[in-house]
Every structure is written in C-alpha cells, then in structure tokens.
Amino acid sequence: MSPPRRVSFPPDTLQEDPPLADSPLSSPKLPEYDRQSSSTPIVSSNLPTDTTNSASAGPRRRQQPSRQVTLDASPPSATRRETTESARTQRSRAGSRRTSNSLDPNPGLMRRVTTVLFTPPKKIGKAPTYWGSMKAAITSTWLNVLLVFIPIGWALYLAKHNGGKDSISDTAVFCCTFIAIIPLAGLLGFATEEAALRLGQTLGGLLNATLGNAVELIVAILALIKCELQVVQSSLVGSILSNILLVLGMCFFAGGVRFAEQAIKSTAAQLNASLLLIAVIAVLIPSAFHFSISSSTSNTDASELANGEGADLLSMSHAVSILLLILYLGYLLFQMWTHATYYVDDAVTGSTQYPEAITNVSEKLKFRNFHRRKHDEEESYSTATTVSDAAVPPSARAEGGEVPATHGPGTAAAETGNRVEHEDAEEEEEEETPQMNVVCTIALMVIDTVLVGVTAEFLVDSINGMVESNPSLSAEWVGLILLPIVGNAAEHFTAVSVSVKDKLDLSISVAVGSSIQIALFVIPVIELLAWTIGKPMTLLFDPYESIVLFLSVLIVNQTLADGRSNWMEGMVLMMLYIIIAVSFWYYPGSTTATLLGCQDSSSVTG
C-alpha cells in the first residue's frame, strides 16, 4: 500500500475546444468532493508533463493550471484492516500457488488432473540419504520401542502351532500381536505422510484408506475361505463403525483441543457423507428384503431359505455388489478427475484459535489503555491532517505547485503493509523438507503393510482359543470391536496426527474415505469372491448391526453438515462408539448370516 498522495491530471486543452462528453472531470454528475478548489492543498507525485509543440499538433494551446483530485488517506484503523485482509489474501494465494494452474480449465483434462494429484502444496526440498531416511523412520516416534513385540508374538505363535507347545496360551499370542501392530501402524502413518508430501491431498487420502483397509481385506478373505461368514460380516461392519465414530471422533477431539473450531470443506464432506449413506443403504437392502418377507414367528430354516428366498438373496447380493463396484469407480472418477478441485487443500484453513484469557486486573488495564491509545492516535491523525493542509503556502495553491508528502500515521501503516508483503513473499518460497527419500518411503510402506498383514493373521488365529479360554468374551464382539480397532490402527494413527496439525480435511478423507472404500469396494469384492469360490455369502447382515450402522451414518451426516467441528462433537462420536461396544457385549448374536449354511452356493441357486 503506497503513501497517501494527491494525483495531478494533465492540463486541459484550448478553451475553444469543447470538453469531452464522457470526461469524468466535466461531467455534471461528478460529486462535489472530487472537484477541488484552488484553495485545496495539493500533494502530488511527479507526473511527466509534455510541454513540447509539434507541427501536427494544431494551433497553439494555452496552458491551464492542472486539475487536482485529492486521494485522501484512510485512518489508521482502516489501513490496518486493509493490511490484514491483504495479508490473508496473499497468504491464501501463496498456499494455493502450486495448484492454481490445475484449476485453469484451459489445459487439457489429463494435464489438469495430473497436476492436481501429483503436485505437492509446497515446494519440496532436498531428499535425505538412505541412512538419513532409515534414521528418521526409526526415530519418528517413541512407539517404535514396541517393535520388539513383533518377534515375540511370532515366536509364540509358531511355537504353539508348529512346535506343539500347548502350554503357550492363545491369550499371550493375542496380547503380543495386538501390541506389535501399534508401532507398525505408526510407521505406516509416517510413511504415508512422507508420500503425501509429494502427492496431492486427494491421492494421499486414497493411499491412506487403501493401506488401512489392507488388513480388513486379508482377514475377510482368510475368514471367507474358512467359511466363517459371521466373522466376515461383523469385521466389515465393525470397520465402518470404527472409522466413522471412533477414528473421526478422536480426530475432532484431538484437533478441538488445540483449536476452538476447525473448518471443514462442506462440499467434499457432504458429498462423502451422502455417498456413505447411499452405500450403506445399498448394502442393507438385502437385509430389508429378508425381514420384510419373513414370517413374524421366525421359523424359517435353512432348507426353506435354500428353496426360495435363499436363491433370491444370493442373486440380489451379486447384482448389488456389481452395482456398488460401478459406483466406486464413479466415485474415484469424480474425486480424482472431474471434480478433483473439490479436494484440493487450501493454505487458509479457517480454523479458530482459542482466545487468550484476560485473568488479572493489570492485563485488563493494559487492554483498556491499548484501546484508549488507539482512539487518541486516530484523533491525532485527523488533527495532523488538518494542520498540514493549513500549513501549505498560498503560493503553492495559486501556482498549482506540489508539496512533498510528509510522513504520518498513514505512511507508517503503508510501511507496515510493505513489511507484511515482504514476509508473505518469504513464506511463499518456504520449502517442505522431507525426512525420507522416495525409495525408502515406498520400501517402508510395502514392508510395513506385509508385517501388519502377517501379524494380524496371527492375531486372528489366536482369537478362537482366547474366546474358549475366556467365556465372558464372544467371537462376535471380538470381530465387531477388537478386530476393527486393530485393522484401523494405521489410518487411526495417521488421521489423529494430521488433525492436530490443522489438516482436518485429510483426516476426514482418511476416516470417511476408508468407510466408503469398505462399503463400495471391500464388501462387493468379498461378495464376488465368495460367488467365485462357491461360498454362500450374502449381504444379509445381522439386524441389530444393520440398525446401528444406519443410525451411526445419519449422526455423522449431521455432524458434518455445518462445515465446522470442535472437541465436543468428537466426544459425542466417541461416546456413541463406546455405547455400541457395551451393547454388543451383552448382545447374544444372530444366525442370519449362516442361514444358508456353508454349502456350495451352486446347490442353493441351482
């Protein structure tokens, strides 16, 4: 913002020449405050004036005094407000500088999408060496000390199942493998963040959701091969509940502890919530079909179901699974191609910090004196402007001369604005220094995913023995509550860690995106895989699980509707998840998933 000045316009033409009709200075509608009298003090910049005569310039023209238009300076408070708004605008432009070209509709679609997906929000600095990358991974979190439980859990499992040592309890294997997954989840989240530095936020969120659901997919496939259909369905429903209630609730709570309110991109959040609701409704349609036509006495057995309704349920489940996969492809196309700009991260998040509390009398007096000095400053600035106008010599007014501008409050505000612009320019060039190079990041993600999958497999195999040795536990509760917590540990750690860094949109894309991927991708893939290998798995879920899942999705929709979050909303979601866990502890379970038995599905449909 330049210092306040008065601008001199070029002199008028010959008096005999008619003035231009559209000239703002000759317009009769010109406001009176724009027409300056000869007595008005003039402060103007040195504008060049052409006083040379040309042969083609026509008759000689008489020079008239230059017209002067006063550009009054704003008061200090208004100047400071303009400086703050300008700084915010420039900071927003600096944060989205690297992705602004991708929003231009002129480039081709491929170039636009590639730029949005693979262009990091900040400039990436020099990558470290291999040794530096390994050191950064090892020292990334103190939870890595728990990595010692990986060989311990593996040794106990192999000694019990392959060594024939029955003295080793399944509870010990379960506890060791459960603890071992915690640091693996932390390393996976660290590697995912390093990969997200070099990718767009959308692709990073999709990567988080994919790696987080790898455990659920492996567990579901192994349970399906063993024809444990109830475990498959309970683990998948529990994964969705864990993501949208526990993970999302902890993200809101952790971010709300640091920020009073965090802004959410309402368009993307509402779209994801609506898509999740549609996916859950589509998954629950076969269950609604079954309970609508079943008798109220509940005397339907497997033979009757196999003769009529069972074949219809299988065919309906297969058709719904194919349609859900098509919907998932459309979701990827929408998120990563046609409307990728909805998921672009902005530098200005809109989060609200907690106000600084004024706790004692001295601070209150300082606060009051500050406003009093501010008011006196504005009054002194107004008085100084009047005095400076009166101090201009009359000769300068009469001759149309110029008076050099003096420094005052407006000039100081302008210097402050220039200083803010300089700081924003330095912030714009700030680099994001990665802690790992690309090769080590990819290697860590692959190795960590494999370790998580193997450790989770040992964990699942020890559940049955642990349930038998502890009658208070039920296999359904373990599959609905414990397995999803273990399976979602990776994205749980990542989502909570980035929400504290004021990246709540990434947390939502991880939590809600993971649930969408389970509903639209994992469940249909498991259903079609069961169809391929001849297992009679349907989308007929437990009735109580179906009701709880539907109500939970509705609550999450209402939570994301206002586009802002706080710690109280996070606590509500977490408490709801705990209430559901307590209710399922006493739930005896249902046999709807095993009504068709574990016979070949061809005998049911044929």
Curated annotation (Swiss-Prot):
Keyword Ion transport recorded: yes
GO molecular function, one term: calcium:proton antiporter activity
Record field: compositional bias (Polar residues): 36-56
GO annotation (BP), single: intracellular calcium ion homeostasis
Keywords on record: Calcium, Calcium transport, Ion transport, Membrane, Transmembrane, Transmembrane helix, Transport, Vacuole
GO cellular component term of the entry, any: fungal-type vacuole membrane
Compartments where found: Vacuole membrane
Membrane-crossing segments per the record: 138-158, 171-191, 205-225, 237-257, 273-293, 314-334, 438-458, 478-498, 506-526, 536-556, 567-587
Disruption phenotype annotation: Increases intracellular free calcium level. Decreases urease activity. Decreases concentration of the polysaccharide glucuronoxylomannan in growth medium. Decreases RNA level of ECA1. Increases RNA level of PMR1 and PMC1. Sensitive to cyclosporine A in combination with; semi-permissive high temperature, or calcium chloride. Resistance to cyclosporine A in combination with cadmium. Normal cell wall integrity. Normal capsule size. Decreases virulence in a mouse intranasal inhalation infection model. Normal virulence in a mouse systemic infection model.
Biased composition (Acidic residues): 423-433
InterPro entries for this protein: CaH_exchang (IPR004713), NaCa_Exmemb (IPR004837), NCX_ion-bd_dom_sf (IPR044880)
Membrane topology, Vacuolar segments: 159-170, 226-236, 294-313, 459-477, 527-535, 588-606
Main location: membrane
Cytoplasmic domain ranges by topology: 1-137, 192-204, 258-272, 335-437, 499-505, 557-566
Membrane-protein topology: Multi-pass membrane protein
Compositionally biased residues, Low complexity: 18-30
Role description: Has a role in promoting intracellular calcium ion sequestration via the exchange of calcium ions for hydrogen ions across the vacuolar membrane.
Family to which this protein belongs: Belongs to the Ca(2+):cation antiporter (CaCA) (TC 2.A.19) family.
Name assigned to this protein: Vacuolar calcium ion transporter
Gene coding for it: VCX1
